[in-house]
Regions:
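Nucleotide-binding motor/catalytic cores of P-loop/tubulin-like NTPases across gene-expression machines
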Residues: 138-140, 146-183
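Hydrophobic faces of well-ordered beta-strands that scaffold small-molecule active sites
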Residues: 27-30, 55, 62-64, 151
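Catalytic cores of alpha/beta
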Residues: 35-57
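Helical hairpin unit composed of two closely spaced alpha helices linked by a short loop
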Residues: 4-32, 36, 147-148
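Conserved, mostly hydrophobic/aromatic
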Residues: 32, 54, 142
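C-terminal helical cap(s) of enzyme catalytic domains, especially alpha/beta-barrels
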Residues: 13, 68-91
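Long, charged amphipathic helices and adjacent flexible linkers at domain junctions
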Residues: 22, 80-118
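Glycine-rich phosphate-binding active-site loops on the catalytic face of alpha/beta enzymes
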Residues: 1-2, 50-74
Length: 184
């Protein structure tokens, strides 16, 4: 954001978030989210709005840095971000959802099934999607379609579980892989 005019930063941020979602990659919004809370116990209205807008744009994760690394009010900063993000989640509108088209020429069965599973949660009385995952690909596909209900991803590798912790709406659960399906 240093080499572009400051008035372009919000638009660029929104475009980058959209591109990441379309590419099914986790997107983290960071950098000075609550910068004034390094030295002050309360954020500015602009900072609160920045957090809410990141949620409205459907970012996967928010991150604090200096506020918690060396700020005077690290716990207050975390509590503030949590409260603002939770309220923004309640207030977000469906018309802000990013529509992710399926490539008609693609044979990506995982993406197709993920989109159908997310659609099903809005049409049927389904309150969660459960998947297992070695690499996290299926869970990331489900996250990209930004469903209303959580994706419970059972991961056989701790690294996959940690990576999925950043994905929108995904609750990753580690389960050691057993020798065969009969053992589960």
């Amino acid at each position: 954001g240093i080499e572009v005019p400051q008035e372009r930063i919000p638009g660029i941020q929104r475009v980058l978030i959209r591109k990441c979602i379309l590419a099914k990659k986790p997107v983290i919004v960071a950098t000075q989210m609550l910068h004034t809370m390094i030295t002050n116990p309360r954020p500015t209205r602009a900072e609160v709005t920045d957090i809410a807008n990141a949620i409205y744009y459907r970012t996967d994760a928010l991150m604090l840095s200096g506020e918690t690394a060396y700020g005077k009010y690290p716990l207050d900063a975390v509590k503030t971000m949590t409260k603002v993000a939770a309220q923004a989640e309640k207030d977000k509108l469906a018309d802000n959802d990013i529509r992710i088209p399926l490539d008609e020429n693609s044979n990506d069965v995982t993406a197709f099934l993920a989109k159908q599973a997310v659609k099903a949660t809005s049409k049927l009385k389904i309150r969660a999607i459960i998947t297992d995952s070695y690499s996290g690909r299926t869970a990331r596909n489900l996250a990209a379609f930004r469903g209303k209900y959580p994706v419970l991803a059972i991961c056989y590798k701790e690294k996959t579980m940690r990576h999925l912790a950043l994905s929108y709406g995904v609750e990753a659960i580690y389960m050691p892989e057993l020798a065969n399906g009969q053992e589960y």
